[in-house]
């Protein structure tokens, strides 16, 4: 009941966002009015969803920017999970109380793009307020997610990530496995997971983000279409098509291993992290953005490796796709506030700022210069994990199946997939019927979004 209520609240808020933005957008644009010079520092409110070490590093960036000048004060405000933060931003905008900057996860990109007049495009912001802005300094695989077909960036990539495999090297040793040879293929992975379970662990493996990692990235890594129209990049009239024989085999294997207690389900989003950090399982799938927190919480030696692949899948491994979030700017602010936001975004894009953020958190560097600076500093010699993620993301030139995903109502679609996955584990529905249900109910949400944005 709780998940159904959450799903309904999210649906109503997203519908309110897209339809309500139309009515509020003109008023918001007109709200950028001339005002007298501020008598003190201008506060820039920055809503985010970061926790733990990542939240500390958000605050660090704000503090560092604030120390460079006296005109603006960037104030980070934690608003809960990604979905909580997005929903809070929707509600705040409709109440004319929107923050200046909001962190929105990648599944909300299509919704934000459709909200014309409610958000101020980053490329326009930087141009209007005198910032040197060169889109080519950013890594294309990342920025394409947040840009128009003309290459115009609508939001600033911030905590970009991709999914990787974490493994407990100490547990590998105990199970008689080579700690320097993590599994490369899925058949190898499942056999190692069974050995970890047999060695005395509570389970062999777990995973976060069932949709993002085991459906979306799984499809991209195997060069399979997740949806039509280049996964939504080429039009709103797209459909989900991920219920392939390969995906069916993959999910049936995991479902069976759940019955055998080799796979342990830890919950939605990133709720499975404690199963790995506490040593209950030896293998785990999570964002590279979890690297800093694992470094802080794991009391054992762990490694980072690429996602496994099925060797009989043509073209695999391909490349993974990004997750994480970008920073969007709301309309309706003063010119002084926009100048402060533009200055802050320029600060965030500096190689030194990006390299620090990347090295402290594990999130991907969004600029080539930050990556090169990190390499020159010898960071990867002692911390190879984050570079595994970068090389995996850039493994091959993206195809229409692996360039990313851009669907409307995608946060709702993910909630549908989470619920069906839990029903599969609970024995309420077969894997085959469950995947079909994910696709059919997800496609219904795509049609709703398409009708609303014709």
Please name every model-derived segment.
Residues 37, 123-138, 182, 224-249, ...:
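Short, solvent-exposed loop/beta-turn-alpha elements that line the ligand-binding surface or hinge
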Residues 63, 67-68, 75, 91, ...:
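Extracytoplasmic/periplasmic substrate-recognition and gating elements
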Residues 64-140, 174-176, 184, 282-283, ...:
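Extracytoplasmic "Venus flytrap"/periplasmic binding protein-like
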Residues 91-92, 99-100, 131-171, 203, ...:
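A structural signal for short loop-to-beta-strand junctions that line the ligand-binding cleft
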Residues 105-164, 190, 216-221, 303-306, ...:
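Hinge/lid segment of periplasmic solute-binding proteins
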Residues 147-158, 163, 173, 187-239, ...:
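Extracytoplasmic/periplasmic solute-binding protein
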Residues 190-196, 235-266:
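Glycine-centered hinge/linker elements that transmit conformational signals in sensory
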Residues 321, 385-441:
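C-terminal capping/gating helix-and-loop segments adjacent to ligand/active sites or protein-protein/ligand interfaces
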